[in-house]
């Protein structure tokens, strides 16, 4: 069954190659780009399949040579080659199974990250800043760009709320597992007795969506303008450049005051609103799935406590996969790839198990 599926994909890839070279299709740039993307998505699977077929062929040849060989040294060499090819065969089978998993259509998209201080007051706001810095430092390591959409600071440098955009190839595929409640355990600077406090911060990761995916009618929004404010509500602008958009059907409210231009703030706010509406629709769809089919790793439930950052022990524990890392300082400086890789692997394993169960 697996080989039949791979042969079908290879044929599809070849058909797309022919279509992409067709001058009549090339004249329609939108259609041509769509076909190019479809082919690019299949290319990695086709390349793995071609290598797999070559490995199988080489194995067959080496086994036939071994059966006819009488020289001891040649036999040893052939046995080593067969062992190496057999190992590569197993590796490729696993790689191909992962490549054949249903792809999240949002994986290649840019993201909006929303971080809000939860339980813990000022300490939660300070940790919200720590998480903001962690994600922006990770983005730098990935050579992604970041842009603040809206920010509400506290007097001592914490963030009550920050919404920012991360632009980069595959940003959503790596950051989507960060949605949920992040818990911090540490001694606040203001705590004279040395008692450990527990605070929480909520993170939401939303894929960027375009106008076609989510249409917002003018009659469904109310737009208010006001003067931008800084620390403690101090006015930092003499014009009404800040924008607040209320989506009347859903009640969602988005504010943006980071830009000096009212028009730019409106554009940013609309982008965030569009992504929030998309997430709301996706969440409503996910809520309809039976509880026993919901993902262990999870990518969307903001009320789910997903991770604990324990400062005294220098550890980070992800509760979904039971992974603990003892490198808190470097983790908060953006060294989070090990955790992300583990979450991706766990998600893939779970999906493969579900696929196996459905095929039985």
From Swiss-Prot:
InterPro entries named in the record: PCRF, Pep_chain_release_fac_I, Pep_chain_release_fac_I_sf, Prokaryotic/Mito_RF, RF-1
Keywords, ordered alphabetically: Cytoplasm, Methylation, Protein biosynthesis
N5-methylglutamine found at: 234
Main localization of the protein described in the UniProt heading: cytoplasm
Molecular-function annotations in GO: translation release factor activity, codon specific
SMART domains linked: PCRF (SM00937)
Cell location: Cytoplasm
UniProt modification remark: Methylated by PrmC. Methylation increases the termination efficiency of RF1.
Any matching Pfam family: RF-1
GO cellular component, one term: cytoplasm
NCBIfam families: prfA (TIGR00019), PRK00591.1 (NF001859)
Family according to the record: Belongs to the prokaryotic/mitochondrial release factor family.
UniProt cross-references to PANTHER family, sorted A to Z: LD18447P
Function: Peptide chain release factor 1 directs the termination of translation in response to the peptide chain termination codons UAG and UAA.
HAMAP family (alphabetical): Rel_fac_1 (MF_00093)
Name listed for the protein in its UniProt record: Peptide chain release factor 1
UniProt source species: Clostridium botulinum (strain Eklund 17B / Type B)
């Amino acid at each position: 069954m697996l080989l039949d599926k791979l042969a079908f994909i290879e044929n599809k890839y070849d058909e797309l190659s022919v279509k992409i070279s067709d001058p009549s299709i090339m004249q329609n740039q939108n259609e041509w780009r769509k076909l190019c993307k479809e082919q690019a998505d299949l290319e990695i699977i086709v390349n793995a399949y071609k290598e797999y077929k070559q490995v199988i062929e080489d194995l067959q040849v080496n086994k036939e040579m071994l059966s006819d060989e009488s020289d001891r040294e040649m036999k040893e060499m052939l046995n080593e080659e067969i062992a190496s090819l057999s190992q590569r065969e197993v590796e490729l089978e696993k790689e191909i199974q992962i490549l054949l998993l249903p792809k999240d259509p949002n994986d290649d998209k840019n993201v909006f990250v929303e971080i809000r201080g939860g339980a813990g007051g000022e300490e939660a706001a300070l940790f919200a800043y720590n998480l903001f810095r962690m994600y922006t430092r990770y983005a730098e390591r990935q050579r992604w760009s970041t842009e603040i959409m809206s920010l509400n600071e506290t007097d001592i440098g914490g963030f009550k709320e920050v919404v920012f955009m991360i632009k980069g190839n595959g940003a959503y595929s790596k950051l989507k597992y960060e949605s949920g409640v992040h818990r911090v355990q540490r001694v606040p600077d203001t705590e004279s007795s040395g008692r450990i406090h527990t605070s929480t911060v909520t993170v939401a990761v939303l894929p960027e969506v375009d106008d076609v995916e989510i249409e917002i009618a003018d009659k469904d929004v109310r737009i208010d303008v006001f003067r931008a404010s800084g620390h403690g509500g101090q006015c930092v602008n003499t014009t009404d450049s800040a924008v607040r958009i209320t989506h009347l059907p859903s009640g969602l409210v988005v504010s943006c005051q980071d830009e000096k231009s009212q028009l730019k703030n409106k554009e940013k706010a609309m982008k965030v609103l569009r992504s929030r509406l998309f997430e709301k629709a996706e969440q409503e769809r996910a809520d309809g799935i039976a509880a026993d089919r919901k993902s262990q790793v999870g990518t969307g439930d903001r009320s789910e406590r997903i991770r604990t950052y324990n400062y005294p022990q220098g550890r980070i524990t992800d509760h979904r996969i039971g992974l603990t890392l003892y490198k808190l300082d470097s983790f908060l400086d953006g060294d989070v790839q090990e955790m992300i890789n583990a979450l991706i692997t766990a998600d893939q394993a779970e999906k493969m198990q579900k696929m196996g169960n459905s095929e039985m």
